[in-house]
Structures are given as structure tokens and as C-alpha cells.
Amino acid sequence: MPLQLAKSLKLHNDKVWSIDFEPVRGLLATGSTDRAIKVLQLKNGKENLLDVLDDTVHKKAVRSVAWRPHSDLLAAGSFDSTISIWTQSDLDLEEGAKLEMELLAIIEGHENEVKGISWSQDGCLLATCSRDKSVWIWETDEAGEEYECISVLQEHSQDVKHVVWHTKHNLLASSSYDDTVRIWKDYDDDWECAAVLTGHEGTIWCSDFSKEEDPIRLCSGSDDSTVRVWKYIGDDEDDQQEWVCESTLPNAHRSQIYGVAWSPSGRIASVGADGVLAVYKEKQNDSEVSEWEISATYKAAHTVYEINTVKWVNIDGKEMLITAGDDGRVNLWNYQD
């Protein structure tokens, strides 16, 4: 089978909303409705629970977690409308060691639930989005102790579900209950909407940029049960960007799609309310039109439970998938064409 369950870890007493992986030391962070944030090390075929962060810091569910690139900082966004920043006390981890994460900062500003957070690739900017229909961009220094809001983006008409930065270009994408994805760009230190992607017929829960530098592409998952691939056409210096829907991926889901992830090797994974984990690959042909096919599906990937998120990770030199669901479990998957 192309998809095989490698491990299933029962980590939380309630649904797991978010996961993020720090590849250098193999650190996995999880956020849950039970308000706990857990940090594990996945290395040498073993999993070691390093720390359970103070579950009294957030008063409601932890909806999103994100490691700062090339850093020891972890950010967590909560339904209590705040974002917490954590730092590691011991950066030299030995096998079997424990790790103490210390609270470094609490960021306040949103008027309602924080749904998504994402660090820019250089780690200088943190984007957050909320049920209050806004996207905030925060600037910080190397220490990550202080955060200044440099822009509040309020062009979405409904709840903003997700934000993600491009890994190579200075672009931010936000996905919303208003059925759109908006692309944001920095114009002389002023963040503005460069494009609005329309076409989905329902809430857009998630999006992810491709890891290639050119062309610039984005995949999105929606309430309408589809995954779409969008492509930027034009010059990176254009003020108003033109994006086209390059492809609607073959139908692998029958319900809402809550998570999408684009791998460094070019595969797209999706998960959702129907409990299906799907992987798609792009057909290799001479056509200018992007064509995709389903490479693998796994039904009931979290038994009868909904799946909230999916990530591609590299563990011990091997590309794998991680999913998290309403069952409080985090599942690790082997994938092979």
C-alpha cells in the first residue's frame, strides 16, 4: 500500500487541532482542545515526550502551533484570543532527556478566537488570524521577547481560518469563511491585498504554498470538498497580482477539507471531516495545463473521527506524513509511490 500507518500516538484527551515539526532536532508540537501543548522528539524510530506546557496559560483550546524557523521559539494561538510564545531552556538534547519550555511572551490584540498563526521564513514576522475577521502581522527581533503589530488586515468579510507564508517569496495567504483566499504583499512597508482568489463554493479552511521558487503556486481546501491549485502569472514586482485556478484536483473527499500540505517533493496531501487521508501527484507531460492524479487514499485514517490537519515531515531522512484528529491522536504515515 502506498500509505501505511507507522505509529499512532494518543497524546491528548480531546481533539488535536494543530501540529508543527521542527526538523533539525525532530521536535513535534501539538495543540488541543484540552488546552495542553505537548512537545515530543521523533528521532531514530522512537518518540520521546519532552514537555507538557502549562495548560493554565490559555483559558480555551489551543488552535494552532508553529515553530519559528531556525530558532528555539514556539508560538501557540488560542480560542482565548491570545498568542503565547515559548522558549526552550536546553538546546542540547540527549536521548531520553526532558525539555523545559518557558513562557516568554503573551501577545494580545485580537478581539476573538485566534484560528491560525504562521512565521515568515526569516522568523522576523508572525502572522495571526482570527474569528474577528482580521489578519495581524507582528514584528519581532532575534530574541523574540517583544512583538509590535505593524499591520492589521481587515478585508475579509468573515472569520479568517488560516494563514501561511511562502517559504521563498515575501507573500502571505489567508483563507476565510467568506470563500476566498487573499494574497498579501509588502509594498514599501505597507501590507496590502495583492490578489483575491475566488472559485470555491464554501469556507476555505486551509492553504499551503508549493516549496518551489518558480512558479509560485498555492493549494487550498474547502467546505465544497475540493482541493484547488492556484498559480501566479506575472512579474513578482507587480502591485496587483494575477492568479489563475490551474487545476481542481480529482475528488477524494465527500465532505469538508480541513488540511492541505504541499511536500518538498511536489506531492499534495489533504484531510478532512470524512476521515480520509489523500495524496495527489502531478502528472508528468508536455502540456502547459497542470494535471493531477490521486496517488493514494486511506479511509478511516483516524477510525471514525474527523482529521483536522496534515503535515509533510522529514524524520531520520525519510519523507513522511503526520495527521491529527478529533480522537486526540497523532498518526505517523509512511508514503511511497
UniProtKB/Swiss-Prot annotation:
Q: Which InterPro entries match?
A: CIAO1/Cia1 (IPR028608), G-protein_beta_WD-40_rep (IPR020472), WD40/YVTN_repeat-like_dom_sf (IPR015943), WD40_repeat_dom_sf (IPR036322), WD40_rpt (IPR001680)
GO CC, alphabetical: cytosolic [4Fe-4S] assembly targeting complex; nucleus
The primary location reported for this protein is: cytoplasm
Q: Which CDD domains match?
A: WD40
Keyword Metal-binding belongs to the record: no
Pfam families reported for this sequence: WD40 (PF00400)
Q: Which residues form a coiled coil?
A: none
Protein name, UniProt field: Probable cytosolic iron-sulfur protein assembly protein 1
Organism of origin is Candida glabrata (strain ATCC 2001 / BCRC 20586 / JCM 3761 / NBRC 0622 / NRRL Y-65 / CBS 138) (Yeast)
Gene expressing this chain: CIA1
